[in-house]
Amino acid sequence: MIKLYNLLLEQVSQPKAIILSGAPGAGKGYVLKGLDLSNIKVLNVDNRYVDNLKQANVSLDLKNSSPEDRSKQAIAMSQANKDFDKDVEDTIKAKESFILDGTAASYKKTVELKNELEEAGYEVFMLYVYTDLERSLKQNQDRFEKSGGKDRSLMPAIVLSTWNKVTQNHKPYKDLFKDNFVSVANTLKDEKINDL
């Protein structure tokens, strides 16, 4: 992980993009805070999504949603994705270095984004944060309560599905990003993050 940190601190003209990959609750935000990359723009669709849910007066406790709230959530996510896509597009046009804070659960979409970024002159990295399913589910379960209702929690089925996709993508992402791939493990067994 130190290699990634040093590369990002280099003062070069080529913009850099870091694509984060990890299941919900893996600790991607925790890892970012530890790297202290506060000078690099962070793009996260969840920020827009949470704002949209609040504006629609929908509880962020998504794991206990009513059918009516799930419908509102879908509308909020659709709008968040549109706004987020524009944010990413504008950032790329401006040649700004940035961190894409998400799960990267879709291998196909990640490959497309990586290609688009490289065509735009970016050096592209992936920071993959692994956690076991138990931690992912526990973090999701506790997220809403621990935040005092200010952060969202997902339905367990969504966490499980995303965890499976992200975990299956580890080797393909390692092969795709080669030397620009860094992975760490964040598990319940101890509080220390380990390089994979």
At which residue positions do the language-model features occur?
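Short hydrophobic/aromatic beta-strand immediately N-terminal to the Walker A/P-loop
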Residues: 17-19
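Phosphate-binding P-loop
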Residues: 11-15, 91-92
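Conserved lysine of the Walker
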Residues: 28
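Conserved GTP-binding G-domain of TRAFAC-class P-loop NTPases and closely related GTPase folds
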Residues: 134-196
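Proteolytic processing junctions in secreted/extracellular precursors
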Residues: 3-11
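The conserved Walker
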Residues: 23-24
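Conserved substrate/cofactor phosphate-moiety recognition/catalytic segment
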Residues: 32-96, 108
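Conserved phosphate-donor/acceptor-positioning beta-strand/loop module used by diverse small-molecule
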Residues: 118-140
